[in-house]
C-alpha cells in the first residue's frame, strides 16, 4: 500500500509492504543467492580440477623432456667412452704389434749375426786349411772336396780328401 502526501512542495511517499510478501521475496532472494553460490562453487571446483589437470600435464611434459635430454646425454657419453676405449685399444694393439716386429727384427739380426760369425769362423778355417793344403798338395797330389750346409741354428762343413 502506498500513500502520497504533498506538503509545501515536498513529496512524501509512504510505502507499507505486506510482510508475508516481503519474507517470501527475501527467501526467494536467499535461494537465488544460494543457487548462484552453489553454481559458482561447482564452477570453481571444475576450474580447479581443470587447472590441476593442466599443471599435471605441463609437469609430465617437462619431466618427459628432462628424461629425454638425460637419455640423449647418457647415449652421447656412452658413445664417447666407447670411442675413447676403442682408441686406447687400437693404440695398445699398434704398440704391441710394433714391439713384436721389433723383437722379431732383433731376433732375426741376432740369428743372422750368429750364422755370419760361424760362417766367418768356417771361412777362416778353410783359408788356414787351404794354406796348409797348398803346401801339402805339392808333396802329395790329392784333391779336396768340400760340402757346406747352413741352417738357422748352426753351420755344418764337411771336407773330404781324395787321393788320386
From Swiss-Prot:
Pfam families: IQ (PF00612)
GO function terms (MF aspect): calmodulin binding
Keyword annotations: Repeat
Domain IQ residues, every copy: 43-72, 99-128
InterPro entries with a match to the protein in the record: IQ_motif_EF-hand-BS (IPR000048), IQCF (IPR039887)
Highest taxon of the lineage: Eukaryota
Coiled coil: none
Protein name: IQ domain-containing protein F2
Species of provenance: Homo sapiens
Gene designation: IQCF2
